[in-house]
A protein has these predicted regions:
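Polar, surface-exposed loop/tail segments
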Residues: 16, 58-121, 188, 196-205, ...
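Single conserved hydrophobic/aromatic residue that forms the stacking wall/gate
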Residues: 1-10, 14
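Long, internal low-complexity/basic segments
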Residues: 159-175, 180-186, 190-266
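Histidine-centered active-site microenvironments of extracellular/periplasmic hydrolases
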Residues: 15-66, 87, 235-241
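A generic secondary-structure signal for well-formed alpha-helical elements
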Residues: 12, 26, 51, 74-82, ...
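C-terminal cap/loop subdomain of S1 sulfatases and analogous C-terminal strand-loop tails that border
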Residues: 27, 78-176
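Structural micro-motif
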Residues: 43-45, 71, 174-175
Length: 266
């Protein structure tokens, strides 16, 4: 909820506050941003204002940080002791060190089952896709919205470029690597080019280490209980009923059609 901060600007409370401004990830009407691991879905603004020795008006910091770091920073500001297992750090702490890499992930969003992982260094974004046979435009909650409807219409009419059609509706590459200094919009996938082999291997190893060290839960399939709960939430909505949704839901659809769904629920 929006709060009129200016109304308390002169108060003692305001003078003691540290204000963090950040946003949700990705624009909802941009198909390649929200819920995906490209820059538009990962990069968010972070502005910090307040009475703290680490904050200087107009100072710009280009370090790689995550919103997890905001959590650690606010806990530290409140006087909490940060446990060692946290995968984040206090941005104002005396032991703060700029991160060499930050990580991002996408799993099931609403009823759309997927798994994507990404690691960002200062210059490169590396993306690992796991469901290679599922196009980026697999059925999802935005399918009844104009951007998705337009994209599907253009594809059916053969009016997309070869690159667009392959990117949105074709098989996904296992790996993607983009030079964020030269290719901000991530159009040219460098993963298969020999000149970038060393960077590909470096980022691949960094991501694999993070997956193992963090015990990334996306390594494990969701249980039937979780999938059934998702099916229950969406099964009566037109956008789900008319879609060729992921095969993981087939058992629930078949049981429902055969009147065995109640028995399956027990």
């Amino acid at each position: 909820r929006s709060t009129p901060l200016y109304s308390s600007a002169a108060s003692d409370v305001y003078k003691r506050q540290v204000i963090f401004f950040f946003s949700d990830h990705g624009h909802n009407t941009s198909l390649r941003h929200k819920q995906f691991c490209y820059e538009g879905g990962m990069l968010v603004p972070l502005i910090i204002k307040g009475n703290h020795s680490a904050i200087s008006p107009g100072r710009v910091v280009n370090d790689l940080v995550t919103l997890l770091d905001v959590g650690a920073t606010t806990l530290a500001l409140a006087g909490a002791e940060l446990p060692n297992y946290l995968e984040c750090q206090n941005l104002f702490g005396s032991e703060y060190k700029a991160a060499e890499y930050v990580f991002g992930a996408r799993d099931r969003c609403d009823y759309t089952i997927d798994r994507i992982r990404t690691v960002r260094s200062d210059r490169y974004r590396y993306i690992r896709n796991y469901y290679l046979d599922r196009p980026l435009m697999q059925p999802g909650y935005r399918d009844d919205r104009p951007p998705s409807m337009d994209m599907r219409r253009l594809f059916k009419a053969g009016e997309l470029t070869e690159y667009q059609a392959e990117h949105w509706f074709g098989l996904r590459p296992r790996e993607e690597l983009y030079d964020m200094h030269a290719d901000l919009h991530q159009i040219n996938n460098l993963a298969s080019l020999s000149d970038f082999r060393a960077e590909l291997l470096r980022h691949r190893e960094v991501l694999e280490n993070w997956i193992n060290d963090s015990d990334d839960q996306g390594q494990h399939s969701e249980s039937d209980v979780q999938l059934r709960a998702t099916y229950e939430l969406w099964k009566d909505r037109d956008i789900f009923k008319s879609a060729d949704v992921n095969p993981e839901y087939s058992k629930f659809r078949e049981a429902s059609a055969n009147k065995n769904y109640k028995n399956m629920m027990n």
